[in-house]
């Protein structure tokens, strides 16, 4: 419990100092890239994903795997989460002995803080702006779970810091969203330094159809690959289903359960 409190405090400190993606990282956002959209206050989310190997750092995975994560939104501005990504030794090429039967998981924290809401202060042109961090610390024998050495090829596989902005526009056909972000990390095996941009479209014709709440189509460049896909919301926004073609050819998909605690 003490280690958890230390790690959680470190995460909040990092959020106040630094500006990872998103459905595939079990948090709010687009497919691979972050956005500045937020969940309602008190929203608890459970996310499960299938991830192709091209979505994963090469130093940890040479195979496709699964991940699951939890997140909670406070005060409509702060989202914190915890994500686990499965290691499967039987899928490592040439693995023998103990390595072949190893079944473990990588664990990391994430956090996002919305510093500006869309249209805040009565300014209709104002975009929403979010600062975020994913996998900010790693474990070591001397420092517990507060070691900040997350660069290179070691632990801290999913490390990223980012700032994202989002603006929505209503049209006669549906809602259009424009998303810009800048991401930074110190990884050698998962290099995402640079700008990211995305466009979303939620057609009005697919809103509020039986149990279907909406379908949001997404095209994005996440600073590494160009991705397309969609996120469908059903049953009064309790469930979301995600399908993605990373680099327009590699498949990721996921399912999310959302619970309002307020």
Residue map of PLM features:
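Cleavable N-terminal export/targeting peptides
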Residues: 1-27, 262
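Transmembrane beta-barrel domains of Gram-negative outer membranes and organellar outer membranes
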Residues: 20-161, 166-170, 205-207, 215, ...
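A generic structural motif
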Residues: 75-77, 225, 248-250
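Active-site beta-loop-alpha junctions enriched in small/polar residues
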Residues: 85, 134-136, 181-185, 222-224, ...
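Outer-membrane beta-barrel "beta-signal"
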Residues: 108-115, 197-199, 247-262
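Histidine/lysine/aspartate-rich catalytic loop segments that bind and position anionic ligands
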Residues: 156-208
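Outer membrane beta-barrel transmembrane domains
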Residues: 193-244, 254-256
């Amino acid at each position: 419990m003490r280690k958890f409190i230390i790690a959680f405090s470190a995460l909040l400190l990092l959020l106040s100092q630094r500006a990872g993606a998103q459905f595939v990282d079990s948090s709010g956002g687009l497919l691979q890239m972050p956005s500045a959209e937020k969940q309602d206050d008190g929203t608890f989310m459970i996310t499960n994903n299938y991830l192709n190997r091209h979505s994963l750092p090469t130093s940890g995975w040479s195979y496709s795997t699964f991940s699951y994560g939890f997140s909670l939104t406070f005060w409509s501005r702060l989202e914190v989460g915890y994500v686990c990504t499965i290691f499967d030794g039987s899928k490592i090429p040439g693995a023998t002995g103990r390595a072949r039967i190893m079944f473990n998981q990588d664990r990391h924290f994430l956090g996002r803080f919305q510093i500006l809401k869309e249209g805040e202060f009565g300014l209709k042109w104002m975009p929403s702006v979010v600062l975020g961090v994913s996998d900010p610390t790693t474990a070591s024998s001397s420092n517990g779970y507060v070691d900040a050495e997350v660069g290179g090829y070691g632990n801290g596989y999913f490390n990223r810091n980012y700032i994202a902005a989002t603006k929505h526009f209503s049209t006669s056909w549906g809602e259009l969203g424009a998303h810009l972000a800048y991401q930074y990390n110190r990884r050698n095996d998962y290099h995402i330094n640079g700008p990211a941009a995305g466009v979303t479209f939620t057609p009005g014709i697919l809103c509020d159809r039986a149990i279907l709440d909406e379908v949001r189509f997404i095209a994005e460049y996440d600073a590494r690959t160009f991705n397309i896909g969609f996120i469908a919301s059903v049953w009064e926004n309790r469930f979301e289903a995600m399908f993605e073609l990373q680099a327009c050819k590699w498949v990721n998909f996921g399912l999310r359960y959302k619970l309002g605690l307020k």
